[in-house]
From Swiss-Prot:
One of its GO terms (cellular component) is cytosol. The lineage of its organism: Bacteria, Pseudomonadati, Pseudomonadota, Betaproteobacteria, Nitrosomonadales. This is Acetyl-coenzyme A synthetase. It catalyses: acetate + ATP + CoA = acetyl-CoA + AMP + diphosphate. The gene is acsA. One of its GO terms (molecular function) is acetate-CoA ligase activity.
Length: 654
């Protein structure tokens, strides 16, 4: 394989502010290096010490890492613990009256819940689940809006050793059905409806539809949280109201102690083709990853008000809403709505209102807010912020700079985090008191995370260069299996040609300082006239143009060049048509030529009012590839938030 070429030049560097560095959990580069050295000298000992310090064990482990059945690795296997105990009970002695969750509803209503109150609610609901016949190892589907109830449901499952599988409330009945069948769910927890952006989203109706599709005989009961009071169909033999089953129980439920390798949850990855892929995570190793990344990457302190904007239907909402913050006894904001309702100032108004100190959101949200109101943050008091984070995709340098300057006022470090559903927790991200920042780079691997960049045959790429991103050693929070499909797990993540390396599926470039730059998914690498170009870099160049709000690049087969470059562009102003579109397309082509080089100039530019995205905000590139080739869209688009946009994007401005 020829190395993937990095054509993006980014020379801006931002060192940690001295006041931040002095107070940081890991202070200065020597502090980071000392942790990395400790992991290198005694890898299993490094993780064992952290597991003993940070997790409350009912039975301490004596085995650290079992590699006897690789790649099905086991961590802390003879230890016993309970995730709910670690997230709630252990805080009751000293922090019972501390606010655990600040819930802000779509309409702005706020409800707070303390750790004592959370403990009572989780215990009552766990008892209700037991009364419905749910026990150790049973699978429970959770299909709820963002709410205190969603977190209570997850924690209640963990408390009794049931395995939860959360399905994002934006997914269709068909997607829900696939997951119910694949996981063999015994019980489904849902709501009558959710509320997003002032509009109701039917949930119970989707559950009813999913169960009618057949093959769901495993489901015995459906528990319904009454969020809106809307009329819904009711099956008295199967359905039960949440408030009724919870009210009937007492508020004490002893935790069920489970093996460290007991599955805590199964989460299906979005955007995969074919049958859904149920990523299975452990209890002990997963919890350790969530805790350490909260401490290292977010520099978490007891006084912080933490806000991760992700829905619990995604891995980010598992690790950095439902588990990580609670395991540290944090106070966090939980948000039901969307960033643009009732207007584009919603996030900033909430940061001011709740005095948020750590704010973690997606580049997609940042870019949309730049477009809708780039100056809006100036109208709010954001002085409580001390750290910003991004998650879900690489962030373009220009969006990074806006976030840093306008939101963070050039004093808040940005934790650009690379990780995956499969990794469980952050893998590459800056330790903010130790690592200099470069806009667009996720910087360096966390201590104890051994990353590399290799050729397609697994050969290590020395020094600077681009290739496949891999993990060289097993880590505690890693995926344990694909539910019910170990062979698919082995082939997808540990292909034979990589000789035991974990294949992330992303391409990356390492610069002269050892910083990692994510260049896109492996299938987002273009081969243009023999040059391998990362789509991310061309997108970043386009977004750096003052006219452009958002861009996506895909390849299209070309007789001469191998692949031609097709750009889908959303402008900050109105979508241009006719001659205006051709003129702007020409300007953007020249811009990319100057920013990167003639090789990267898009052959085609198509303008849209938006890009096709999943309901979590990820660009659906497979649809863009089909559009570029002129193919009919025949694949499942149930997760597509804005289907009407596809017709706009069929038209080329030249």
């Amino acid at each position: 394989m020829s190395s993937i070429e990095s054509v993006l030049t980014e020379t801006r560097v931002f060192a940690p502010h001295e006041t931040f560095r002095q107070a940081a959990t890991v202070s200065g580069l020597p502090g980071y290096q000392a942790l990395c050295d400790a992991a290198e000298q005694d890898y299993t000992g490094f993780w064992a010490n952290l597991a003993r310090q940070e997790i409350s064990w009912q039975t301490p482990f004596t085995e650290v890492l079992d590699e006897s059945n690789a790649p099905f690795y086991r961590w802390f296997a003879d230890g016993k613990l309970n995730a709910s105990y670690n997230c709630i009970d252990r805080h009751l002695e000293k922090r019972a009256n501390k606010i655990a969750l600040i819930f802000e509803a779509d309409n702005g209503d706020v409800a707070n819940i303390t750790y004592r109150e959370l403990h009572q609610r989780v215990c009552r609901f766990a008892n209700a689940l037991k009364k419905q016949g749910v026990g150790l190892g049973d699978r429970v589907i959770i299909y709820l809006p963002m709410s205190i109830e969603a977190i209570v449901a997850m924690q209640a499952c963990a408390r009794i050793g049931a395995i939860h599988s959360v399905v994002f409330g934006g997914f269709s009945a068909k997607s829900l059905h696939e997951r119910i069948v694949d996981v063999g769910a015994k019980l489904v927890i849902t709501a009558d409806a959710g509320i997003r952006g002032g509009k109701q989203v039917a949930l119970k109706a989707s559950v009813d539809e999913a169960l009618e599709l057949g093959g769901c005989e495993s489901v015995e009961k459906v528990i319904v949280y009454q969020r809106t009071g809307v009329d819904i169909a009711w099956n008295p033999h199967r359905d039960a109201w949440w408030h009724e089953v919870e009210a009937a129980e007492n508020d004490n439920c002893e935790p069920v102690w489970v093996d460290a390798e007991h599955p805590l949850f199964i989460l299906y990855t979005s955007g995969s083709t074919g049958t859904p892929k149920g990523v299975q995570h452990s209890t002990g190793g997963y919890l350790l990853g969530a805790i350490m990344s909260m401490k290292w990457v977010f520099d978490h302190k007891a006084t912080d008000i933490f806000w991760c904007t992700a829905d619990v239907g995604w891995i980010t909402g598992h690790s950095y809403v439902a588990y990580g913050p609670l395991a540290l006894g944090s106070t966090q904001v939980v948000f039901e709505g969307v960033p643009t309702y009732p207007d584009a100032g919603r996030f900033w108004q909430m940061i001011e209102r709740h005095k948020v100190s750590i704010f973690y959101t997606a580049p997609t949200a940042i870019r949309s807010l730049i477009k809708l109101g780039g100056d809006l943050p100036h109208k709010y008091d954001l002085s409580s912020l001390r750290l910003l984070g991004t998650v879900g995709e690489p962030i373009n340098p220009e969006a990074w700079m806006w976030y840093y300057k306008v939101v963070g006022k050039e004093r808040c470090p940005i934790a650009d985090t690379w990780w995956q559903t499969e990794t469980g927790a952050h893998m590459i991200a800056p330790l903010p008191g130790a690592i200099d920042l470069k806009p667009g780079s996720c910087t360096r691997p966390l201590p104890g995370i051994i990353m590399d960049i290799v050729e397609e045959d697994g050969t290590h790429i020395e020094g600077t260069g681009g290739g496949l991103l891999v993990v060289k050693k097993p880590w505690p929070s890693m995926i344990r299996n694909i539910w019910g499909n170990p062979e698919r797990f082995r082939k997808a993540y540990f292909p034979e040609e990589l000789n035991g390396l974990y294949l992330a599926g992303d391409s990356a470039h390492r610069d002269e300082d050892g910083y990692f730059w994510i260049m896109g998914r492996i299938d987002d690498v273009l081969n243009v006239s023999g040059h391998r170009l990362g789509t991310m870099e061309i997108e970043s160049a386009l977004v750096a143009n003052p006219l452009v709000a958002e861009a996506a690049i895909v390849g299209k087969p070309h007789d001469i060049k191998g692949e031609s470059i097709v750009a889908y562009v959303v402008l900050k102003g109105e979508r241009p048509e006719g001659e205006a579109a051709k003129t702007i397309a020409g300007q953007l082509r020249e811009w990319v030529g100057k920013e990167i080089g003639p090789i990267a100039k898009p052959d085609e530019i198509r303008f849209g009012e938006n890009l096709p995205k999943t309901r979590s905000g990820k660009i659906m590139r497979r649809l863009l590839r089909s559009l570029a080739k002129g193919e009919e869209i025949t694949s499942d688009i149930s997760t597509l938030d804005n289907p009407a946009i596809l017709d706009q994007l069929r038209q080329s401005a030249g």
